[in-house]
Amino acid sequence: MTNYWPRFTRDNFENSVPPIDYLNWYIPRLQEARRHNLSFSGMQYNWDIQGMLGEKIAEIGKPYMADIEDPRIIIAKREGVSPDNVLITHGATQGINIALLTAIAKIRDKVEGKIIVAAESPTYAPIPQTALILADEVIRVNKTPPTTGYGHWRINYEEWETAMKKSHIIMITPISNPSGWVLHIEDRDWIIAKAEENDVIVIADEAYNDAYRQIEQSRAIHTFGDNYISINSLTKVYAMGPIRFGWLISDSKTIAIAKNIFMTFSGVMSSPTMRIAAEALKRLDTVDKEIEYYRRENLPILRAVLEKHGIDWNEPLGGVFGCFELPNNMNSEVFADQHCKKHDLLVVPGSMFSDRMTSWVRVAWSIEPSLFKSAVEALDKSLDSALN
């Protein structure tokens, strides 16, 4: 069976670049256009672009400079920082690339030997695999599910400290994908303390943080001082993936380096992206309300079906997705490709995120309630088929 989880080594890809394997699984199944879809990791919201831009939509292809409110100013105001602390990028995944290049630029002239990056698991594959391209070595550090069955996924301090003592940079995801759980406040503060102690730069992919703004534990990493880089975008929480709009926030010296790197690779942002984002950023509260509405309407239906099948459900405190473990160590790829496909349903196997999650399934409640109800009915039938 093909392995789809993220890679932390270049084994079998010396003098080359490993693929993002999960896309080889996911894209063909998206193209099947199954009737029911619980696979989305981001909010599904239909923005009225024409209504939002009005007559200015005719200018969408014209240069935007001096013609729109600077999105950096809007983001800076929202995050309580200066515009000089913000860099706009083409989405969060480019933000990962730029952030890591920036961190390496800050240290490479003083590092003797290899540049080493620690990266957490489970994770979004481009995080460790960007490090495989740009750094010399990647050390995997793990988050594990709660032993009680409910609560935060936690880190092992001994394992993480050993890795951080060897590393120059650590890459984390405060809202874990696929669990949906926010980084425990004790673990977060411990990571910050060890980063300071060992002079480690912290890069945080915070693409899901905005769905947890009401939770104190979701405090952005950039707020802890210099050498902390936050990555965010309008993709996952705000359903603007097609325009590829993201940003970095850090201290002004770090952002100045990041800006030079961005301009070297990309020049400037596209006009359609900047024009749409400048307007969408003023209306994010509309989507915030929809997220809470979807949670209220959709989660009780999901809880009931999982309880019916005797499946433990570790529901996250916020956001739009979570994961559960199938009974009897059932392989989740088999579940997705046989039982779910039979009922025209798409879910995401946990093996897309870690080799330790081969019996886990990620589901999202980020779709309109009537669609979600039908999808969960298909999930119910799929579980019946798989477990009975």
What are these regions (language model features)?
Residues T102-A131, E158-E161:
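Conserved PLP-anchoring active-site segment centered on the Schiff-base-forming lysine
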Residues G80, A118, N329, Q338-V347, ...:
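PLP-dependent enzyme catalytic core of the Aspartate aminotransferase-like
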Residues S39, A278, Y294-R303, W313-L326, ...:
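Conserved glycine-rich beta-strand-loop-beta hairpin in the small C-terminal domain of fold type I
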Residues T2-I98, R283, A386-N388:
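N-terminal small-domain helix-loop-helix segment of the aminotransferase-like
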Residues I115, D136, E197-V200, D226:
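A short helix->loop->beta-strand "cap" motif at the edges of active sites that frequently abuts
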